[in-house]
Amino acid sequence: MNKVFPLWVKTPRSIRALMPDVLWQMPTKDKVLYLTFDDGPVPEATSFVLAQLEKYNAKATFFCIGDNVRKHPDIFQQVVNAGHTVANHTMHHISGWELSEEAYLEEVKLCQEILSQSLAAMANGGTKKSTKLFRPPYGKLKPSQYRKLKNSYQIVLWDVLSYDFDLNLSGEIVADSVIQNVEQGSIVVLHDSVKAFPRLQVALPKILQYYAERGWKFASIV
């Protein structure tokens, strides 16, 4: 039986051209993959991700929801202590299309503040700074929000979307669709969320093993 893969796994160049200031893919010809995880930290999913990454000495970028950082400071600390990059995914994960420019910028500001405060409160976090990386929830921004934010943050979207949040897909399909679309420097979106976890726990080990066996490295965006 033929596998049915989701559409739009690979971001078309025509879409990238609409927002040239966005980081879609890292500029490298080396065999390096940039795994990113949205919507954490949450206890079970994020802890699983950290354990899997450690097996392969892999680094990644975690786009954190500010409210989840507030709820789970211990998990956030584990992410930082493991040497991963933490970045802004707004305070409450609301689509930019649903908020005014002012309200959306406040969502971003609140998340940035809690990231900075959480890092400063850590015993070894005094020298760590929260990054100025930002990923909009759902990848959705109004033009006015985009114009404002690109002056203060490096907006990061993706080259490959895993669709691990899709309840109709299996973890195997998620892994295979990522593997078929990755190239050097690809930024891949996965989710350390409760919703995505049933697929993530199948897909992530397969992705890590596949690329590690072929000599790839896994790096964070800095």
Which residue ranges define each predicted feature?
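Short beta-strands and strand-loop turn motifs
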Residues: 88-90, 156-160, 187-192
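Domain-start "cap" segments at the beginnings of catalytic or binding domains
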Residues: 112-113, 117-156
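Divalent metal-coordination and catalytic microenvironments
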Residues: 38, 53, 62, 86, ...
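Short histidine/acidic/glycine/proline-rich micro-motifs that form metal-
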Residues: 66-69, 92-95, 140, 161-164, ...
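Alpha-helical scaffolding segments of alpha/beta enzyme cores, especially the outer helices
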Residues: 48-51, 74-81, 106, 110-113, ...
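His/Asp/Glu-enriched short active-site or ligand-binding loop at hydrolase and phosphoryl-transfer sites
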Residues: 140-180, 215-222
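Catalytic grooves of carbohydrate-active enzymes
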Residues: 182-195, 199-222
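Active-site beta->alpha N-cap acidic-glycine motif
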Residues: 5-97, 103, 110, 114, ...
